């Protein structure tokens, strides 16, 4: 990394460190009209978190929203989702399977956005349950269809979707990508995007990260043990080559990917850490700045706080520092190969975390978009292009499949 950029980063974090802790506050949210306009704009350009949602459907839902009430938001998007779900059931009953599959997929996306970014109201909790139901209908129509796996674990269970490529058998087991959902995405999103891996003969096992979805517990030191247990399970499946496994984490889940690369390095061929927090992200000085970013659509603090299971800003700021890989004395340890990805202008996770990880421990590879925001995305490098041109080829190489 150029010395000038390092110096700039150091200076920036010096400013954060000197910022008075007493001034910690959350920036005011968008007004309802601002939120509606920004939501529609993102739908129009197929941008996160509305990727795959039709602009016309966004307009229909937003037309019914008059306030920032979470249940009103959930109900408006759910009504649009329900129309797709009803049509999909009718199409399936009539034997129009492709039409049904497309309808269930749209219902899943819309119900899931109804609960976005976290199901923190009764209406959003209902929307999440409906999203899971719609996705289950979609999943059973996929070819090959994924299997919902439930692994007993510490009196609870780890719930994940395992999708195996066609033609796999014990004599030629498939390599696997362990995909971990992020702060506001869910494991089902990764199943939806698994086709690129399946076509290459790569299996996927998709899990929610701690503190989200159906994960068995909140995010804390040691929560990575759920993924270690998942790797144990993978090793019992004859269809999977447990010696060829890569873990993929995007945004918050990049943290778990990085940690697994260290603590499970003997069992991993590699780890993708795309926009993942490492150390600086967890410091109060960064959070008091980043919680006000307009890069995030809305409700960033409730989403982040729910990962830890805390309610107040003070609790949240006090909880975070212990999660740092530097504070846990892990960052300098040997690791499995890592691909670090992010954008220079990420306002959600500091680019300094990528720099810190890159220059610690084992040798790593990095891809940084100089014009990129969170996870590296920009107009020239949307999410899909980063995956297709950067992440997927790297994973294939680590699994011995070339590009």
Residue positions per predicted region:
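N-terminal cap/lid segment of alpha/beta-hydrolase-fold proteins
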Residues: 77, 81, 120, 126-170
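Short beta-strand element of the alpha/beta-hydrolase
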Residues: 171-182
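Alpha/beta-hydrolase active-site loop
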Residues: 189, 196, 218-239
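Alpha/beta-hydrolase fold nucleophile elbow
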Residues: 239-251
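Hydrolase active-site cap/lid region
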Residues: 262-318, 336
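Short beta-strand/loop motif that positions the catalytic acidic residue
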Residues: 334-335, 340-342
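Conserved alpha/beta-hydrolase "acid-adjacent" motif
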Residues: 347-353
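Catalytic histidine-centered segment of alpha/beta-hydrolase-like enzymes
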Residues: 372-385
